[in-house]
């Protein structure tokens, strides 16, 4: 089984690669097993540097390259009569720290009947659908929780 251990920023236009579709849950993990469309099993043991976004590339030590695509999965789709109503739903779902995919005409989140009922209570339509899930990364996606000042930052830290 090929084991993919490196994340690639990009690849050259002539680079050969295979593709794999993964759910959002799997793309959040640094270690996983999956199967290519051909049925070939692969594994990943990647650095913990964040989510694999659809279109990301990973590689083996031997140089084999794999493009990761978002796999269609069961989601709740929120639609509204007005853009403002859709904005209100995004606000309320965001307050619950729900992974949320935004499009100009709809919001998508992982199935949760309590959240669906809340959104329907706001007067919006909620339907189940199969769709690739690429939620927003959020303002704190790469945020460290160490709020101490480093010695370098401390030299420039000014209170006004």
UniProtKB/Swiss-Prot annotation:
UniProtKB keywords: Chaperone, Cytoplasm, Nickel
Gene Ontology, cellular component aspect: cytoplasm
GO biological-process terms attached to the record: protein folding; protein-containing complex assembly; urea metabolic process
Superkingdom of source: Bacteria
GO molecular function, one term: unfolded protein binding
Pfam annotation, one family: UreE_C
Subcellular location(s) per record: Cytoplasm
Primary site of residence: cytoplasm
Hydrolase keyword on record: no
SUPFAM superfamilies (UniProt xref): Urease metallochaperone UreE, C-terminal domain, Urease metallochaperone UreE, N-terminal domain
SMART domains tied to this protein: UreE_N (SM00988)
Listed HAMAP family: UreE
Functional note: Involved in urease metallocenter assembly. Binds nickel. Probably functions as a nickel donor during metallocenter assembly.
UniProt similarity note: Belongs to the UreE family.
Protein name: Urease accessory protein UreE
The encoding gene: ureE
